[in-house]
Amino acid sequence: MKRVLLVVLAGVGLSGPASAQWLGMPVWNSPKGGTGITISGDYGKPNADWGKGNAFGARGTLGLGSLSATLGFASWNPSGTLPTAKSVGGDATFRVIGGSLLPININLLVGGARATATGVPGTTTIVAGGGASLTLPTPGVSLEPYVSLANRWHSASGSTNSNFGWTIGANLGFGGVMGAHIAYDSESLGSGSTGGILGVGLHLSLKVPLGM
C-alpha cells in the first residue's frame, strides 16, 4: 500500500494525485457564479483508494458575474507514514448559461496546481471541464445543487496520465455572508480502482463594490 500511494503522490503509473488540483479535495464548483469576494475553508476526506487521511485547505474567489477566479492551497496528510502533500493553485470558471433570471446554470472550468511532498517528485495537475446547477427558491436559504464533469491530467518526472472524474455537490447560503458547501468527487484510477473524496466547508461571501 505504501508503494502504491507513493506512486499516487508522484503522479506516475496508473493513477494521478488525489482529486483535483488541490490534493485531497473535490473539484469545487459553483456554476451560478456571482459577484464579490468569497473566502472558503475546506476539509477533505479521501477514501482508501486515495490513501485515506485528512486534507485541509483555504480558497479565495473573486466573482465578476459570469467570470470567477480562485486561488487556494491545501495540505493533505495520508494515512500511515507517507509524507504530507501541499498544493497551491487556482482555477477560473465562466458561466455560459444562467444568471439571476434563469434557474439553470452551466459553466466551463479550468484549473491547475503544483503539489510537493518530501521524498517524491513534484506534481502538476490540470483540470478542464464544466458543470451544471439549479438555483432553488428555498425560503431563507439559497441552495445550489450541482454536478461537474472534468478530465484531470497529472504530470510528474516527465510522465503524464489522464483520468476522468465527476463531482456532485451543493452550495448553501444562509441569508447573509455565511454559507456552507459539500461535495463528493469520484475519479477513475484504472485497474478497477476509483478514488473518492468527501469534502465539506464553510465560506464567507462579501458583496463588495467592484466598480463594474
What are these regions (language model features)?
Residues 22-34, 66, 80-82, 97-106, ...:
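Short loop/turn motifs that connect adjacent beta-strands in outer-membrane beta-barrel proteins
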